[in-house]
Amino acid sequence: MRLTASAIAGQFGLTVLGDGSTEVSGVATLAHAGAGQLSFLSNPRYRPQLADSQAAVVVLRADDAEAAKGTALVAKDPYTAFAKIAALFDVAPVCEPGIHPSAVIDPTAQVSPGAHVGPFVSIGARSRVGDGCVIGTGSLIGADCVVDDGSELLARVTLVTRVRLGKRVRIHPGAVIGADGFGLAMDAGHWIKVPQLGGVVIGDDCEIGANTCIDRGALEDTVLEEDVRVDNLVQIAHNCRIGAHSAIAGCSGIAGSAKIGRYCLLGGHVGVVGHLEICDKVVITGKSVVRNSIHEPGEYSSGTPLTDNRTWRKNAARFKQLDVLARRILAVGKEKE
């Protein structure tokens, strides 16, 4: 597929600088783009690459337009504009409607004639798969699940039981949704399993990364509201609620019954203690641990920043003496009084 700069600008409301008839057939980074490819500049640290880039078209802000050698598309937010343009060249294989002969479908399950059910799929009792859905190879849909219209389960996705997916949900390989929550009670020195009788509800336009686990609730449902984006290898425990338009980066863990607001961003390897609340529009930076509820929007961090090993070892040794040093300072203060 080849598109002109003018056609792209018209589709996404961008301004063309230079030759609008310039054609592009793909996308690439500034450093590696060649003839016929489109790139973008959004982060100032990559501005030096603009002068040497061989990209046919570059999406950038108006402030950077003078540095562009060839055709440019001016956007208020170049990264968002690039994402929309790149989607034009992301041609996924077409999955034709139909059920593969190796699929096993319970007689009480309902599968839309417009859905694609791939090889070795299993669909359990009373579950429903909507129109335009794609159920990838080896995926398992347990009993009493709903996969609404236009949703896609890539290979080896597991919906254990009582999982309801909204429209246009995309789940990547290896994800497990609706497994038992980690509910235990101690009785006479032995653990007793607490039955997990709830389910999982995932709203429209959510995306769940590979090998992520979202446990079903003990009594009430675990809920992800609409347009939540979850990266790979994330654990969301039972009875959590994630607000709409929030995003959670890889290797994060959210303990049971935590409530996260709308438009929140959690960096990689963030830990959230259970039974707390995070308000809307909170950013938690990578490797932070949230131990208390957050009631004010903003950016929050915890942990030790990276430094050279020698400095870190000295600081670690001093940290062990922190209580002693604090007592000495208090004692000096009292003496001066």
From Swiss-Prot:
Pfam families: Hexapep, LpxD. Keywords: Acyltransferase, Lipid A biosynthesis, Lipid biosynthesis, Lipid metabolism, Repeat, Transferase. GO terms for biological process: lipid A biosynthetic process. The active site is at 238 (proton acceptor). Catalyzes the N-acylation of UDP-3-O-acylglucosamine using 3-hydroxyacyl-ACP as the acyl donor. Is involved in the biosynthesis of lipid A, a phosphorylated glycolipid that anchors the lipopolysaccharide to the outer membrane of the cell. Homotrimer. This is UDP-3-O-acylglucosamine N-acyltransferase.
